[in-house]
């Protein structure tokens, strides 16, 4: 890819994982390896792995035991779209204005705010039976 910072023109990443906490390590490793294979720079790989980890953790917590999917694709010049989807079980993700912990010391509730801070944009789509959170990541510094 001639030193580019993202996987433009490469095949997309599309995998499904078991809905268990034990699967999170494999998910992070697979995403990291795929991005490095596609010559993404270190900073981009680190951000994408953290975003993946937060979204996959949310998917497992929202639907324990149900598989979740991870997709990554180039989304234009210097952008990568990373999506994690899971079965809709009982509750949908909170509205954007509630993407923070209820108190500063709360043990949970930071995932979507972390994803939002690391992403150019975040979209939550809820279908009849599937929740899909898509993060748009900038792969190169703004010019």
Regions of interest found by a model, annotated:
Residues 14-26:
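STAS-typified acidic loop motif
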Residues 22, 39-43, 123:
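Residues in soluble alpha-helical coiled-coils and helical-bundle/repeat scaffolds
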Residues 21-24, 45, 112:
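Short, structured helix-loop boundary elements
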